[in-house]
């Protein structure tokens, strides 16, 4: 097997939790877009070009009204501001990857960040191709789920309420897997404590960015001490 196929093999197994989560959540998004009156091309193209779940749900409503570019820009920036901190924390891991880093930056979703930041590169696997395949597979799962959701939407008659819980379950599984593999739980415990405190102080709608800033500072200081 060539290095690309080896990397794809390992990346596929690593990304299986994302396939399950994005499959169901993508279906939900596609069904939502169908209910708004859009055909499958809209969720498919938005999934390919925007690839930011929360922003895509918002854009569905925006496309129905008068388009305000500045409002759309500020809304998407506010919803996805946490990605700034994802990028900062991945600078070292993406160093020296050449052209691959451009797609890695574009495809940095919450779930992909959770995988690539915690995942150890399998022995004998090319780092660049491994990270690239994970990122590509994750986006592919989302695009397929969103497209299928719109296509099968007219044929679904059962209640889909609560389907978005799969995202919470997926993050829990990723956290548990990382916990079992790591020798030092300081980073995981600090993340839980800091997020919990920020949730209490800033409320559920405003705690994510504050949590990311504090966690980034804490981990940077911890790394310098080491």
Regions found by a protein language model. Give the residues of each.
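Helix-loop interface residues and adjacent transmembrane-helix termini in multi-pass membrane transporters
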Residues: 37, 66, 96, 124, ...
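Short, Lys/Arg-rich, polar N-terminal cytosolic tail immediately upstream
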Residues: 1-10
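Juxtamembrane membrane-interface segments at transmembrane alpha-helix termini
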Residues: 55-61, 85-90, 176-181, 199-208, ...
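Alpha-helical transmembrane segments and their membrane-interface exit regions
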Residues: 51-55, 78-85, 170-176, 195-196, ...
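Membrane-embedded alpha-helical modules
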Residues: 128-210, 217
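Helix-loop-helix junctions within the multi-pass membrane cores of secondary transporters/permeases
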Residues: 3-4, 73-164
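Pore-lining transmembrane helices
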Residues: 13-105
């Amino acid at each position: 097997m060539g290095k690309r196929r080896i990397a794809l093999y390992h990346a596929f197994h690593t990304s299986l939790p994302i396939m399950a989560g994005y499959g169901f959540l993508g279906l939900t998004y596609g069904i939502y877009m169908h209910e708004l009156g859009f055909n499958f091309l809209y969720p498919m193209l938005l999934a390919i070009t925007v690839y930011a779940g929360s922003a895509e749900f918002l854009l569905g409503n925006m496309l129905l009204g008068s388009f305000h570019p500045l409002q759309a820009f500020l809304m998407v920036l506010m919803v996805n501001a946490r990605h700034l901190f994802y990028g900062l924390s991945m600078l070292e891991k993406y160093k020296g990857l050449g052209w691959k880093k451009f797609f890695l930056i574009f495809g940095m979703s919450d779930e992909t960040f959770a995988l690539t930041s915690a995942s150890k590169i399998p022995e004998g696997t090319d780092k660049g191709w491994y990270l690239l395949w994970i990122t590509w597979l994750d986006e592919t799962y989302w695009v397929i789920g969103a497209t299928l959701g719109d296509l099968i939407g007219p044929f679904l008659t059962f209640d889909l309420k609560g389907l978005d819980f799969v995202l919470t379950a997926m993050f829990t599984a990723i956290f548990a897997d990382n916990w079992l593999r790591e020798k030092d739980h300081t980073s995981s415990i600090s993340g839980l404590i800091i997020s919990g405190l920020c949730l209490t102080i800033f409320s559920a709608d405003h705690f994510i960015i504050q949590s990311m800033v504090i966690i980034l500072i804490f981990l940077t200081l911890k790394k310098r001490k080491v």
